[in-house]
Structures are given as structure tokens and as C-alpha cells.
Amino acid sequence: MVRERTKKLRGGHYGRGMKAGRGKGKKGGRGNAGMGKHKWIWMVKYDPLHFGGKGFTSHHLSTPDVPINLGELENIFENLKADGFVREENGETVVDLKAAGYDKLLGSGNFSVKSRIIIDKATEKAISKLSAIGSKIENVGNTAE
């Protein structure tokens, strides 16, 4: 007796009719298609990191400057002296604003103590007011108005 050959229906046309399924359309059940729609539960459980990763990340460190005005410096001068940020070196008063946590010296107000001030940044107005009374500024990286 001859055994009949079993049809395994492995071709691409089976279950779709004669002409359906010839093109590349209607592939919603294959691969990763539909992961955001009808396969969402599988995606959330087995591949939770599939979606995402969009957006913008700023990689430069941008910390805002901590400013101090000349008038404010005049007001807190005694407190800075008590905290050890004002010292005497070779008969000269040295004010270390950088160590006190300030980054920029602004020119509003007046400062009357002839001294040497250590700070990273200072405005042109602050520099001109201090040079008028004979003070000096050290470690000024850039001057901006």
C-alpha cells in the first residue's frame, strides 16, 4: 500500500487565497510589527526598554555663577573677616571671595577698603571702581558686563 504524501502547507499563500499575500503588505503579525499596539503586553513584560531613548541631554556642566555686588561686599566685609576670608599679607588686605563661594564680582554699589580681591570673574564696572580706590583683582578669568 502506498502512503499518501502529507501536505504541510508551508508556502506563503496558504490561508490567504490565491492572490492575497503576494506583496509585502499585511505583515502586522510578523517580527516586531505591532509592538506599540496589539503586542503591547508582551512588550511591557519581556522588552520594557524597547521604546524610549529619545530626547536631548546637555552634556556640558552649566552651573550658574554666584555673584556679589560691591555694595554687598561692603556690608558683609566684617562677617567675611570673622569667617577667615579676609587676611593681612605683607601689610595688604586680601579678600578671598573665591574661597567664600562667590564666582563673579558685580559693580553695583561702592566698596571703600583698599585691598586685593581674589575672584574668578568681574565686570568692567567693578574693576574700574576698585582700581579708582587703589584695589587690585586677581584670578579674573574673563570680564563680562
From Swiss-Prot:
Any single GO CC term annotated in Swiss-Prot or TrEMBL for this entry: cytosolic large ribosomal subunit
Superkingdom, natural source: Archaea
GO molecular function, one term: rRNA binding
One matching Pfam family: Ribosomal_L27A
Key words, A-Z: Ribonucleoprotein, Ribosomal protein, RNA-binding, rRNA-binding
Disordered, as annotated region: 1-33
Compositional bias (Basic residues): 1-13, 19-29
InterPro entries noted in UniProt: Rbsml_uL15_N (IPR027386), Ribosomal_uL15 (IPR030878), Ribosomal_uL15/eL18 (IPR021131), Ribosomal_uL15/eL18_sf (IPR036227)
Biological processes annotated in GO: translation
HAMAP family, per the entry: Ribosomal_uL15 (MF_01341)
Quaternary structure and partners: Part of the 50S ribosomal subunit.
Family in the record: Belongs to the universal ribosomal protein uL15 family.
Function: Binds to the 23S rRNA.
PANTHER family, per the entry: 60S RIBOSOMAL PROTEIN L27A, LARGE RIBOSOMAL SUBUNIT PROTEIN UL15
Stated name of the protein: Large ribosomal subunit protein uL15
Native source species: Thermoplasma volcanium (strain ATCC 51530 / DSM 4299 / JCM 9571 / NBRC 15438 / GSS1)
Gene: rpl15
